[in-house]
Amino acid sequence: MARTILVIHGAGEPRRRRSKVYWEPLLEESLGRGYRVQAPRMPRPEHPQYWTWARRIDVLIGSTRKPILVGHSFGASVLLKYLAETVRRPALAGLFLIATPFWGPDFPEFALPPDFGARLGDLSPICLYHSRDDTEVPFEHMERYRRVLPHATVRVLDDRGHEFNQAQFPELAADIRGLALQRAV
């Protein structure tokens, strides 16, 4: 049975992807047999609202047995908030977060609860990916996540920008394939 990977895109991304190379469509191919990637369009990506995205994520996760979650940018931050605030957190195989903004008090709709690290302490694995040359989400945001989620695996990259515009994302594919190895041990 194929493992389901749910990829939650960032705000405004479907419009921006039209002319760029992007890793997401090739993720399933790079993972090989045994994986099925779903990348649903989220509601109003040009003007996102947390609750509309959270409801959509709830439906997607609820219809999938122990999914692997991958979020990019705004999508990654919504996944974190959803998982931190969900009373009955669904069973997940792993959480992979790319270029994730750390929303502060200026953005209360998107800000995480102050104790979100403790709330997510039993969620494993969590992998964080961030490029030092990201011009949209400062590298310091990843450092903040690293401090609050000390059990997370952190992958620091140097030349991927914010969009991670490339045909392949070998680090992500390797980490996802590593889940199967962890289960086999």
Each model region followed by its residue ranges:
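A conserved short beta-strand
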Residues: 89-103
